[in-house]
Amino acid sequence: MLNPKRGIGIVTGANVEIGANVVVWNYVVIGDNTKIGDGTVIGSFCDIGKNVVVGKNCNIQTHVTISNGCVIGNNVFIAPNSSLLNDKYPKSTIMTPPVIKDGAVIGGGVTVLPDVTVGEKAVIGSGSVVTKNVPPRTVSYGAPAAVVMSLEEYEAKRSGFVEARRKVKK
């Protein structure tokens, strides 16, 4: 490992690679042959499986489960209590982990099912169950998750909300 770990109760498997300036909080398990990119933050009580790749500058918040073999791009945000699953037909011996592309945002309590790709800069709303691929630069939510708007529409709404909140605080 290239940097000292932070927190207590951290368990790492064999051949784990943790990049520079990575912060790992309390009670995190990181499986064998997993790679964590530079600048990533991993919150407490996360379970990261074997053969996982996490890109640079990701924020994985508390109580997140990332199953064996998942691939997470750079600058990905995963909110608390989310799960990335890899077993499409339990108890299968063939794992089909999801892929989360660069810049994606996964809200709290989201479940991403196996064999799914969440596209670049896609946003998944809290509590969603992602059962199929999510196109890049879209916002999806629900159970099952469905595309509800483009990233541009979302950013415009968010910008308006932030501006309105600033006026209220004055």
Language-model segments: what does each one mean?
Residues 7-8, 13-14, 19-20, 25-26, ...:
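Left-handed beta-helix
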Residues 3:
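Glycine-rich adenosyl-nucleotide cofactor-binding module
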Residues 136-160:
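Conserved beta-strand-loop-alpha-helix hinge in the C-terminal portion
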Residues 107, 154, 168-170:
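Short, structured secondary-structure boundary patches
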Residues 88-90, 116, 150-152:
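Conserved catalytic-core motifs of eukaryotic protein kinase domains, centered on the activation segment
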Residues 158-170:
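Acidic/histidine-enriched, glycine/proline-rich intrinsically disordered or flexible terminal extensions
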